[in-house]
């Protein structure tokens, strides 16, 4: 198990479209485990492989209070979405920044689990929002892409300043 480095904007690798996982094997399972370690270490609720410079369609999520409800989505597909909602979202790749993002209230997805078994899931609330957020990462999209150009620029400047301060520390 390992904690991986999370990419931050403006790193262009965050914009790369992830490739489907061809086979769920021990290497993919190790990536999943490392992604959970990374997500928990960074105090996140979701992480897409793209964020750790692995360009495969893998997502890990745990929105539970006790951090014991791991959800693995390999090659996720959005089947249905319904309603409208939105919360102030944050992102491990855009540290300490939040913004209101419009999302579907409910989603239905199909994916493979950690063992490569197919399943379908209907989700609402925070889980539905998190799934949509992480699936965006797999196609190179970030939550700031939903914002005005001015807000995007302000957030980028704040993150770049934060990264400069951290690199000096």
From Swiss-Prot:
List of residues binding Fe cation: 91, 133, 137
Catalyzed reactions: N-terminal N-formyl-L-methionyl-[peptide] + H2O = N-terminal L-methionyl-[peptide] + formate
Keyword Protein biosynthesis: yes
Gene3D superfamilies, sorted: Peptide deformylase
Cofactors required: Fe(2+)
BP terms from Gene Ontology: co-translational protein modification; translation
EC number: 3.5.1.88
Active site feature: 134
Enzyme class: hydrolase
MF terms in GO: metal ion binding; peptide deformylase activity
Entries under InterPro entries matching the protein: Peptide_deformylase, Peptide_deformylase_sf
Family annotation (SUPFAM superfamilies): Peptide deformylase
Highest taxon above the source species: Bacteria
Keywords noted in UniProt: Hydrolase, Iron, Metal-binding, Protein biosynthesis
Co-factor binding comment: Binds 1 Fe(2+) ion.
UniProt signal peptide: none
Assigned protein family: Belongs to the polypeptide deformylase family.
NCBIfam families per the UniProt record, alphabetical: pept_deformyl, PRK00150.1-3
Job of this protein: Removes the formyl group from the N-terminal Met of newly synthesized proteins. Requires at least a dipeptide for an efficient rate of reaction. N-terminal L-methionine is a prerequisite for activity but the enzyme has broad specificity at other positions.
Name this polypeptide is given: Peptide deformylase
The organism of origin for this protein: Klebsiella pneumoniae (strain 342)
């Amino acid at each position: 198990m390992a904690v991986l480095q999370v990419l931050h904007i403006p790193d262009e690798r965050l914009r790369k479209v992830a490739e489907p996982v061809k086979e769920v094997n021990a290497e993919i399972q190790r990536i999943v485990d490392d992604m959970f370690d990374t997500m928990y270490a960074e105090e996140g609720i979701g992480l897409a492989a793209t964020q750790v410079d692995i360009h495969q369609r893998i997502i890990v999520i745990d929105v539970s209070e006790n951090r014991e409800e791991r959800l693995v989505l390999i090659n996720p597909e959005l089947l249905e979405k319904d309603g409208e909602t939105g919360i102030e979202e944050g992102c491990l790749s855009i540290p300490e920044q939040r913004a209101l993002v419009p999302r579907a209230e409910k989603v239905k997805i199909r994916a493979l689990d950690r063992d490569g078994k197919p399943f379908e899931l209907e989700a609402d609330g925070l889980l539905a929002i998190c799934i949509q957020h992480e699936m965006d990462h797999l196609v190179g999209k970030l939550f700031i892409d939903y914002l005005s150009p001015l807000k995007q620029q302000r957030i980028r400047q704040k993150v770049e300043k934060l990264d400069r301060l951290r690199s000096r520390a």
